[in-house]
Every structure is written in C-alpha cells, then in structure tokens.
C-alpha cells in the first residue's frame, strides 16, 4: 500500500518543483553525472517538457505529443510556468477523472503520483551537479518505490522491454516492504530514498551497502534483479 494519498502527493509535487526550480539559479552548464551527456539545462528542459506532456494528458483520452522548448524563452521562467500549470491542473481536477495515462488506472490521480518521483529523481540528479547535497522525504521515496513495483515494472514487461524475473528481490524500509520477481529471494534493508535511487539506477548495490544497507540472501540474486530493465 502506498504511504501517500492524492492530496499528499500534490503537496509534495509543489515542494519538489520548487526545489528543482532553485537549481536553475546555478550553473546551467554543469554536467549531470547521472545523465551522461546532459548538463543542468538539458535536464531542466527534459523535465519541463515532461511536465507539459503530463498536463496535456490530463485533458485527453489520447497520448499527447511532446512539445519542444522555444529556444528564445529563458529556461528558469519556462520551467516555472510549466510546473505551475501542472500543479494547477492537478489541483483543479478530480483525481478520479478519466484521462490518458501510461498504465492503469487511467485517471488524473495517476499523473499526480507519476510526476512526484519524476521530479524528485531529477532534482537528485541536479543538486550534486551544483555541489548541493540532496535529501528526500521517506514517505515520498517509499511511494516512488511502490510505483516502480506496481506500475513501472509491469509496464516494462507488457511492452516487451523486460521478461519475467526468475529471482525475487525484497526491498525493506523499516516495516515497509516490496517484492520484485519470484523465486529465490534476496532481501535488502535500506532507507527508502536509497531504494528508490537504486531502482532508478542512480545508485548501485555497492553504493547502498557501503552506506549501511543490509543484504541477506544471495548477492548475485539481488544484482540480477537490479540489473533488469525495471524502469524506462
């Protein structure tokens, strides 16, 4: 079960887009280690386009097109405008209202959930590039872990990007736990933020173990599951 509801996610989204926006007062040419070939400006352009794409989906039964960023528009203002439009549309609409989504349920609330980890992970990408230490709310990170297990991996499998996993990897954060795959099981206990970054391949298993995570069961099992195409 997710630790957040629609209203809680919207509050977190407001905070996350504001935190990402503050990154745009730094060096826009700083390389982003988590996204090879991108700098902070490229990352912000990507995220701003995703926000606008999601906003378009809220009022459509069909997949919207990605719109390019006009080259003459200042990046920080363009990002802020798109983020504000997304938050405003989500706040104005019933989370149960039908719309196009990447995966069931095909309702507005899907995007309220999807855009939070999207923004959180990219904020985590941007801040180290600017020498700023990132942090994440534990419940928000746990909601993102649940989304990978409940939405992203099933979608990857349905699209033929990932076959069924022959091993299982259980992820634990305190009393919360999630299981990926089936069969021989490894169990990793770590803070939810580390688990989220691990699933989105912003951390390696070695990184989180060095930071104090505890692994029981075969390490090879954990590595096999984590190497899979769990997310796009």
Task: State what each model feature region is.
Residues 137-183, 187-188:
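Hydrophobic protein-protein interaction segments
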Residues 69-78, 139-155, 215-229:
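Short, mixed-charge aromatic SLiMs
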Residues 185-232:
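C-terminal interaction segments
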Residues 18, 26-65, 103-158:
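Short, contiguous alpha-helical
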Residues 1-25, 230-232:
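Actinobacteria-biased recognition of intrinsically disordered, low-complexity terminal regions
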Residues 6-14, 37-44, 72-80, 109-113:
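Amphipathic, non-membrane alpha-helical segments in soluble helical-bundle scaffolds
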Residues 59-111:
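Hydrophobic/aromatic-rich structural module bridging two neighboring secondary-structure elements via a short loop
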């Amino acid at each position: 079960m997710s630790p957040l509801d629609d209203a809680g996610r919207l509050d977190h989204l407001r905070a996350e887009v504001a935190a990402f926006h503050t990154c745009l007062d730094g060096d826009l040419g700083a390389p982003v280690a988590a996204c090879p070939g991108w700098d902070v400006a490229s990352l912000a352009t990507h995220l701003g386009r995703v926000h606008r794409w999601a906003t378009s989906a809220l009022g459509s039964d069909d997949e919207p097109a990605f719109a390019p960023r006009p080259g003459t528009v200042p990046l920080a203002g363009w990002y802020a405008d798109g983020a504000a439009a997304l938050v405003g549309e989500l706040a104005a609409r019933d989370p149960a209202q039908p719309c196009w989504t990447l995966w069931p349920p095909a309702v507005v609330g899907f995007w309220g959930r999807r855009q939070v980890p999207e923004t959180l992970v990219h904020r985590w990408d941007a801040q180290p590039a600017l020498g700023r230490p990132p942090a994440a709310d534990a419940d928000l990170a746990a909601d993102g872990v649940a989304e990978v297990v409940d939405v992203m991996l099933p979608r990857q499998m349905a699209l033929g990007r990932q076959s069924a996993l022959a091993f299982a990897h259980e992820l634990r954060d305190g009393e919360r736990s999630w299981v990926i795959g089936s069969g021989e099981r490894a169990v990793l206990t770590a803070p939810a933020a580390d688990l989220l970054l691990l699933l989105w391949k912003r951390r390696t298993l070695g990184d989180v173990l060095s930071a104090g995570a505890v692994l029981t069961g075969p390490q090879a099992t954990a590595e096999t599951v984590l190497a899979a195409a769990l997310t796009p």
